[in-house]
Structure formats: C-alpha cells, structure tokens
Amino acid sequence: RNRRWCIDQQA
C-alpha cells in the first residue's frame, strides 16, 4: 500500500 513496497503489498 506504500510506494516502497506497493509492488508486493499493493492489494
């Protein structure tokens, strides 16, 4: 949900 790990926690 962030900009640093949105690729993994973009759900």
From Swiss-Prot:
Protein name: Lumbricusin
Source organism of this protein record: Lumbricus terrestris (Common earthworm)
Extra remark beyond the main annotation: Induces proliferation of human neuroblastoma cells but not of human colonic epithelial cells or human adrenal carcinoma cells. Also increases proliferation of mouse neural stem cells. In human neuroblastoma cells and mouse neural stem cells, inhibits apoptosis induced by the synthetic neurotoxic compound 6-hydroxydopamine (6-OHDA). In human neuroblastoma cells and mouse neural stem cells, increases ubiquitination of cyclin-dependent kinase inhibitor CDKN1B, promoting its degradation. Attenuates motor impairments in 6-OHDA-treated mice.
